[in-house]
Structures are given as C-alpha cells and as structure tokens.
Amino acid sequence: SLLLTSSVQHHLLRRQTRTQISMVVEAGDVREIHHVALLIAYGAAAVNPYLAFESVEDLARDGFLTVGEEKAIANLRNALSTGVLKIMSKMGVSTIMSYRGAQLFEAVGLDDAVIDDYFTGTVSRVAGCGLDDLAEEVAIRHRVAYPNQWTATPHRNLRTGGDYKWRRTGEEHLNDP
C-alpha cells in the first residue's frame, strides 16, 4: 500500500493536481504504527487498517483479549493515533497537515529507479530491491496465504515472523541470542 500511495502522490504532484484530492488508504497490510506513519508521510489523508481491526475484533470475540470487540478496536485506533503523534513530535512536526506528504523518512534497501519513480525526493543511502524483487515478495506471501492444496480446516496459526525483534519461532538473524 505504501508503494501505491506514494506513486499516486507523486503522479498528482507531477500533474499539479495534488491539492484537488484527499487520499484515503484502505489496506490490509497496515498493522503497525510505523505503517500508518509512512502512509501519511507519503500522502494519505486517512488510513483504514481494516484487516488489523478485523483481527483485533476476532481476538476479542474468541476470548483471547480481556476486553470486548468495541473496546479492542478503540484501543487499537488509539494506539495507532497516539503512536503517529509521538513520531511526529519526535520529528519536530506539530500538525498533521505539515506531516502529510512531507516524506520525512529515509529509504533503506530500494534501488535508485524505485526511489526516483515512486518515492521521488526520498533520501536513500543503501540501495537494494527493484520492482521485480518487490513483486516476487508479494507473490511469495500470496502463495503462503493461498496455497494450492486447501485443507478441510483453515489454519489458525500465523507465523510471527520475528522481523524486528527476536522470537523463538521467528527468522534467524546474526544477532539472535
């Protein structure tokens, strides 16, 4: 969703029509404060992380949380909102209008062509993936989510990933304990 949001943002800027619309991003891949912060920084006026809301709602309904569905959703909404405000504060930005579209982040691991075409003006000191690499990542995730062999009972256990911090069942990293 970030690639698409930034792409639309820059297309509208190049056509000098950006101020004529507001982008509302409804995305299933948004699950963390950082994701919301990036989407707003790259042009989104509002973000609806629908899959995160549905997941929290299911967890509350199934008794995995100590609060009801409405409270769980309100808690997530509050956490995302206050988290974005905290990020803005640390960057010295006091209004959402100043933050939206400001691109105050540095890209890590995207090649120059992707930066130039889709994240124009974003600082990037470490190059890496191109569009083909990103497409393959999406295809891999799709194959995992929708395997060819369907089982009678849907799986309920999702991988934790361990992308940001060590997890016993997460990916292996050089600095694991």
Feature locations, PLM:
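Conserved mixed alpha/beta core segments that line enzyme active sites in large multi-domain catalysts
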Residues: 1, 11, 171-175
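Alpha-helix-loop-beta-strand connector modules within alpha/beta enzyme cores
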Residues: 2-25, 75-82, 86
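Catalytic-face loop-and-helix region of soluble metabolic enzyme cores
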Residues: 14-17, 55-69
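Beta-strand segments within the central parallel beta-sheet cores of soluble alpha/beta enzyme folds
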Residues: 20-28, 98-102
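Catalytic cores of alpha/beta
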Residues: 30-43
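Flexible, glycine-rich loop/tail regions that form catalytic "lids" or insertion modules at the edges
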Residues: 35-36, 46-51, 63-177
